[in-house]
Amino acid sequence: MKKIEAIVRHFKVEEVKDALNAKGVQGMTVTDVRGFGRQKGHMETYRGTEYAVEFIPKSKIEVVVSDANAQTVVDAILSSARTGQVGDGKIFISDLQSAIRIRTGESDDSAV
């Protein structure tokens, strides 16, 4: 199994969700996060005072899939989240040792 974590722009979450649903992904977790990469930060003005925003708000999408479906899910995220601009985000792929569905006790691929 693979855990796929994607950091994407907020306005791309629905598009990514729809792309993943079309590929058969049945569940995901979405979290509001803040961070920076090459995009760094930006300047904003509030009540006439300019200040630096160092951490950019993004959304983190987490999906657990079988090894066989991992590349399909990554491709769906890439195609739906990309704008071509700095700050589109990142995808992280990790091996997942085990997963257990609490309600039934099913484990591993049966649990996802």
Each predicted region: which residue ranges?
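Positively charged, small/polar-rich N-terminal and surface patches that mediate targeting and assembly
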Residues: M1-V112
